[in-house]
Regions:
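Active-site metal-binding motif and surrounding structural segment of the metallo-beta-lactamase
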Residues: 25
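Residues on the solvent-exposed faces and adjacent turns
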Residues: 29
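PLD/PLD-like phosphodiesterase catalytic module centered on the HKD motif
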Residues: 1-15, 19, 34-103, 107-166, ...
Length: 364
């Protein structure tokens, strides 16, 4: 078993495994913009490897990219399946190679997640876990119901709530948690109960009703992982936050990990991130400052993308104004109240759309 730590490890481990695929690659995709991974998947097809991609039906704001990805994959000879719409989202991220190697990831196949965010991934050759991942993948590709397998393979909505609640309840000394948003009432009550019992609980991320729980916001990079380290001996890593939707209404996948070396790496990374948010050492402080330049570049790139995406909006507004003029006459263009109202309506609509897009990105 191997732990992948982002952004430190980058795509190297994934690319190497894909390049060494001999018979098959099965990949579940929620967000995707990595040319290096796309090129490697296409090259695998060229070697005679059967590549199957299960692509999410929706990921608010990115459906156009997903549909374009489907077409590129199909043209390259990749078999494409699209997730059903029975759940709010299919948010899992996994890869099965030659039906003997399994990757379970908290991060998407994007530059933002891999290069600029705290995320984790697990590579395992455990035959039981690989078999269960294949069972889930095939069920979702065929849009058949999935029945939960071993508790170590955590799937929403099949068994996540039960397994993760039990995982938290069994903490004796400590729970260290990465989670962008803990808001499920049952999970919060469980955490508060363990805190009252003397269990040390620290959260990097956000948590509602956090009595007796220490919470800090990750400042040196974006947070995009859901991880729980219990008593320094076991860990959960997956795509599901402790939120109602991600436990009950979305496809999410995670693993319970007991490998000592991997759990130790989780623990060390958490402590490093935690300490960096509390003054830390001079070395930690310098690391915290370093991403600021990168963050600026990411922001500039995001603004450029936003500007391109907003160009069609101009045409839409023009059409709407012409329609109003056609119905009410040109005099409305000289009415200050009408002009002011139109500006406010457009500004409000854009503001709402941007807010929803940002919230969706944080939850993805």
């Amino acid at each position: 078993m191997k732990l992948i730590i982002q952004p430190d490890d980058g795509p190297t481990v994934l690319l190497s495994a894909l390049k060494n695929a001999k018979k098959s690659v099965e990949v579940a995709i929620f967000r995707f913009d990595r040319n290096d991974i796309e090129t490697t998947l296409k090259a695998a097809v060229g070697r005679g490897v059967k590549v199957t991609a299960l692509i999410a039906d929706v990921n608010r704001g990115g459906e156009k990219n997903l549909r374009q990805l489907e077409m590129r994959f199909l043209q390259a000879g990749i078999t494409v399946a699209r997730s059903a719409n029975d759940l709010i989202r299919y948010h899992d991220k996994l890869i099965v190679i030659d039906r003997r190697i399994l990757f379970i990831l908290s991060f998407n196949f994007t530059h933002l997640d891999i290069d600029h965010s705290r995320g984790f991934g697990i590579l395992t050759k455990n035959a039981t876990l690989v078999q269960e991942a294949v069972k889930l993948f095939e069920a979702d590709c065929a849009r058949r119901p999935y029945t939960a397998g071993p508790d170590s393979f955590v799937v929403s909505p099949a068994n996540s709530r039960k397994v993760l609640r039990t995982f938290l309840e069994r903490a004796k000394k400590q729970l260290l948690i990465y989670d962008p948003q803990i808001s499920d009432k049952e999970m919060i009550a469980t955490l508060q109960g363990r805190a009252k019992a003397g269990v040390e609980i620290r959260v990097i991320g956000k948590m509602s009703g956090r009595a007796n729980v220490m919470v800090r916001k990750l400042t040196r990079m974006r947070l995009h992982t859901r991880t729980i380290i219990r008593d320094g001996h076991q860990a959960f890593i997956g795509s599901q936050s402790l939120r109602p939707a991600e436990l009950d209404s979305r496809r999410e996948v995670g693993l319970i990990v007991r490998e000592p070396k991997v759990v130790k790496q989780f623990l060390e990374t958490f402590e490093s991130d935690w300490n960096a948010m509390n003054g830390g050492s001079a070395q930690e402080a310098s690391k915290e400052e370093a991403p600021s330049v990168t963050s600026q570049k990411v922001a500039e790139k995001a603004v450029a993308v936003l500007a391109r995406e907003l160009r069609p909006l101009t045409g839409t507004v023009k059409k709407a104004v012409k329609k109003v003029v056609a119905q009410a006459g040109e005099e409305v263009l000289h009415d200050k109240i009408v002009k002011s109202t139109v500006k406010k309506v457009i500004k409000k609509a854009v503001k709402k759309a941007v807010k929803e897009a940002v919230q969706d990105s944080e939850k993805a």
